[in-house]
């Protein structure tokens, strides 16, 4: 047994499930660890580092923006808050209080716990939740009906990619994106 486990009286884990917060999330790969070694003993303006990381990540992923966060839950909360507030400081400072469109559309089967509750991460931003479909199924028609019924409330839509979601009868990401784009929902 590894010395680390003995010193701290911890039980070793054999991970056969993938990335899971409850067992330490991810093991840092060697490339990332080398990057940490380069910067760990230096002070740096975090805004500059965040901007640089955003540019590199968004370029690599071919997205309009990207941001490094502490976890998936933090990413959900911060993304929803950013969609709501954009660069309006008064909205940023008022969070989690939101006015106007403040609901997130999400498939009912995507409100899972992956080490943190998706529902809680959404609510921490100040947003409300509008679910669509059933726990084990969601159709294109379900999404369209939910959007048409709640169009004046929806701030954005959320699609959760996780092995905790039941993919059987879940709406495909591309279809979800196509429908939301048609209604101009981020």
Can you describe what each PLM-predicted range is?
Residues 2-23, 27, 54-57, 62-65, ...:
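Conserved PLP-enzyme active-site core in the AAT-like
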Residues 14-52:
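A glycine-/small-polar-enriched, mobile loop at the entrance of the PLP active site in fold-type I
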Residues 68:
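Active-site/ligand-binding surface loops and adjacent short beta/alpha elements
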